[in-house]
């Protein structure tokens, strides 16, 4: 698929410590990611209903359907980065059914999420097919 992931010893040790000793932190993190997903979904439903934020499935990425945009899937992330300075994962790289979708990182502060959502929705409005 062209996606590679690596890990390092420090990251591995931090992950082990987080799961063994940081339950309150993990709970707050998961609550914040869920709140960020609700915020993003509501913003799209209100301001850009042609594009859909799908139900979360146990990850800190939102899966967003941008097939309503007049952009070829292969060009989507390039244009998004050039016009908004937002870097996302292009869904077509994750398999055939992902064309026209993006993965948007929710593991961020509320301030970053609000600014990114504003830019993403403005981009979608500029490129919507109708």
Where do the model's predicted regions map?
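PLP-dependent class I/II
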Residues: 1-130
